[in-house]
Structure formats: C-alpha cells, structure tokens
Amino acid sequence: RTGFYMARDLTFYNMTASHEYEHERIKVLSGLMAGEYDAVLTTPDAALGYTVPPEILKKTTVAINADEPLDLPELAKRLTGAGFVRVDLVDSPGQFALRGGIVDIYSPFGTFADSDGDTKSGAYALRIELFGDDIDRMGLFEPDTQRMTQSVMAAELQPARELLCDKPALERLKKLIAAQFRATKNEDAMEELVRETTAVDAGINFTF
C-alpha cells in the first residue's frame, strides 16, 4: 500500500482552476492519518513544503449521518471552512450547492457507507434531501445527469483545500482589500477589489 505525495505548483490561480493535484495530496495525507499506507513516495520539494496540519485536517473533515438531524446553515459554514466553493450547480470536485431543501456536495476525497453498510472511499458527488432538519434521503448522484444512483447511510468529506482561512484570517483579508480600495483611484482595480470582497463574503476560496 503505497501513496505518492506530489509537490505543489506554486503559481497563483483562482477557484475555477483545476485542483486535481491538491486533492491528491489531501487524499494521501488523509490516508496517512487513517493508517492506509505502508509507504509514501515523494520528492524533496514536496516533503519540505508546508501543508495542512493533522489537527486541522481532522477538524475540517465533515461527517454526515442519514439518521441524524442536519443544520443547513451550519453545514454550509463548515463546508466553506473546509475549502468548498458554493456554486449554483455542482459539476466539479470541491463544490457544493444549496437549492431549497436539497444539498449537493462534490467531495474530492472521502468515505461513505452504502445501504449495505459497506464503506468505500474516493471522489464522489453526494446529494442530501431534507425535510425540515431531518434527512429524508441521501445518496450519490452523477454530476453530468444530476440523477441519484445509490443510497448512502453515512458520509465523511475531507477538506477540499490544503490552505484554509479561518474567520479571523478572512476578516484581516477584508481589511487589506478595503485599504487597497481606499488607496486606488483606478476604476478597473476598484471593480476587482469589490469582486474580491464579494468572493470573501460568499466563502469563495483563493489559494495557491
């Protein structure tokens, strides 16, 4: 049982960029915590690079049980804190959507237990249908067709990003953006700063 932990590409990109390699690193880190690997292959650059600490990885893992009530605003807050991006329609790993009493989450990596009690792991798209705070139905769905394919009794979602901003960090970021807004007279720059503030308020994550 061997994993490969690859180096991070230190180029800046926004939420629409592919995070495939980052998700692979989170998968390996999660596997290490769970004792799933006998060895991990990596490079000197990757081994020396900073990543999410074990306690943060554990803290930002989101667990959902079909038999337990679900607080929708709290779930949205936890997903945002775990690096997931809220969108209108889920089609890529690391996204989630809220539509009335329906929640769609595309986990880059996690585990789930099916209706037979068998536990599986990997990337998967999860749909939760609520009746009030109770889960009426929970299962996997195909992002391409938006159709549910099988029932799920429990799910554990690993964070979607390595570098996560907590609330104090986001508040500091908003203050920095506001200071830049006051200092600039360029209309294009001002519009971009407004978009950045809106993104922060909406829980959109920008990382590298």
Q: Model-derived features: where do they sit?
A:
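ASCE RecA-like P-loop NTPase motor cores
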Residues: R1-F208
